[in-house]
């Protein structure tokens, strides 16, 4: 197959080939990463990248939008059907952009946000001091108890003391299910709006493998990749017409200009895939595979935050180990297992070193790996961590896992 890119920019082409090889031969276990559908990539690489379309369907500032109006309208309708809600904005460029747009729509400068503490699994956009949300608004945080689960009673006490305008329930590194109903009770008790950030678990939500944020949340944000397996992008959902109008204005012209029509088309394609029965089977596999991995690691006496997992990710706890999350990240990477270092509750090391790693099952499940493979992977992770400085062992495991990975190709035909 001939590629224009190979002829016009051989350097970038070779880097893409190199990355294609890495994705095929390594075991991708970063919880926020996944392998998207070939049809999604085709839509993203289409001529739609040429079209500017500021505004919304049938309310554009540019001409020639009659076709992209159909595309965005279809993406909106599919999103509403998928999440069983009345309003959807599909223009957000990312999950962070989606969250920032929600704040821009519903808060005033220096209003109060209550979100999950970063070291307990929250996201930068939930009020971290280093992010815009921590600078433009007064941010406060709730966390987890000694058992690693969200402490809802403590969250209520903090909310009663702080009286935030918005409470964010969601995470980037929390291995348990969110109780949206309890968070709504907390929000109602203090007169706050409730934002459900389901970026990580959206794929599980639509497959009924995780609690649904509606009707409890006033507004819901998500990414369209991660467990949804769509293109990289953001999404905002609500059942409130007034909030929906504010969200639309906050996205355009509030925080963004022209939407990425090739990505919006890809979102529509992804949503259609998510609506298929096969996707429900995939989401079920994601959860069951993670259960196998957690069980295997626990049987090998490895400590997990909260003692296990209820979703697509787990966190390994190295607080009492001589090695750090960074050490484990590097060692496992040398063995062909890609994870990420992560802060954990009770963190004692700095964020560039950390005392934990985050591991996800979504990408390998997309390749078709099941319980047998995840048990093997769990045992190999244990072997590496128990002899973390053994480079020869890491290289040996890498070759073993490469053989296994090649039995589950990412894509069955050349596609970049």
UniProtKB/Swiss-Prot annotation:
GO terms for biological process: glycine biosynthetic process from serine; tetrahydrofolate interconversion. GO terms for molecular function: glycine hydroxymethyltransferase activity; pyridoxal phosphate binding. (6S)-5,6,7,8-tetrahydrofolate binds at residues 118, 122-124, 242. CDD domains: SHMT (cd00378). Its EC number is 2.1.2.1. InterPro entries: PyrdxlP-dep_Trfase, PyrdxlP-dep_Trfase_major, PyrdxlP-dep_Trfase_small, Ser_HO-MeTrfase, Ser_HO-MeTrfase-like, Ser_HO-MeTrfase_PLP_BS, SHMT-like_dom. This is Serine hydroxymethyltransferase. It comes from Helicobacter pylori (strain J99 / ATCC 700824) (Campylobacter pylori J99). The gene is glyA.
């Amino acid at each position: 197959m001939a590629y224009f890119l190979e002829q016009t920019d051989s350097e970038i082409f070779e880097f893409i080939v190199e990355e294609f090889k890495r994705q095929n031969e390594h075991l991708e276990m970063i919880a926020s990463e996944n392998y998207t559908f070939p049809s999604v990539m085709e839509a993203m690489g289409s001529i739609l990248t040429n079209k500017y379309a500021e505004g919304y369907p049938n309310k554009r500032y540019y001409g020639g939008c009659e076709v992209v109006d159909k595309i965005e309208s279809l993406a909106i309708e599919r999103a509403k059907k998928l999440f069983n809600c009345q309003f959807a904005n599909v223009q957000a460029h990312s999950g962070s952009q989606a969250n920032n747009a929600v704040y821009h729509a519903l808060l005033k400068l220096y209003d109060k946000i209550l979100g999950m503490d970063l070291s307990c699994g929250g996201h930068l956009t939930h009020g971290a001091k280093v992010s815009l949300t921590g600078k433009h608004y007064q941010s406060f945080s709730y966390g987890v108890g000694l058992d690693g689960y969200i402490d809802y009673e403590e969250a209520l006490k903090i909310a009663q003391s702080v009286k935030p305008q918005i409470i964010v329930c969601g995470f980037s590194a929390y291995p348990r299910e969110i109780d949206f109903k309890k968070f709504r009770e907390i929000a109602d008790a203090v007169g706050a709006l409730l934002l459900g950030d389901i970026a990580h678990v959206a794929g599980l939500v639509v497959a009924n493998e995780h609690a649904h944020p509606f009707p409890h949340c006033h507004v819901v944000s998500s990414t369209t990749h991660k467990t949804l397996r769509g293109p990289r992008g953001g999404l905002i959902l609500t059942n409130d017409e007034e909030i929906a109008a504010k969200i639309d204005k906050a996205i355009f012209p509030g925080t963004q200009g022209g939407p990425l029509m090739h990505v919006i088309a890809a979102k529509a394609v992804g949503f259609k895939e998510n609506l298929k029965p096969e996707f429900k089977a995939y989401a079920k596999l994601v959860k069951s595979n993670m259960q196998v991995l957690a069980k295997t690691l626990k049987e090998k006496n490895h400590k997990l935050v909260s003692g296990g997992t209820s979703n697509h990710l787990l966190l390994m706890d190295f607080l009492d180990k001589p090695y750090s999350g960074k050490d484990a990240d590097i060692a496992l990477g040398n063995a062909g297992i890609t994870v990420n270092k992560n802060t954990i509750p009770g963190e004692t090391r700095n964020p560039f070193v950390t005392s934990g790693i985050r591991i996800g099952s979504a990408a390998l499940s997309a390749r078709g790996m099941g319980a047998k493979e995840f048990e093997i992977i769990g045992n190999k992770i244990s072997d590496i961590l128990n002899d973390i400085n053994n480079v020869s062992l890491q290289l040996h495991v890498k070759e073993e896992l490469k053989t296994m990975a090649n039995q589950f190709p990412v894509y069955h035909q050349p596609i970049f």
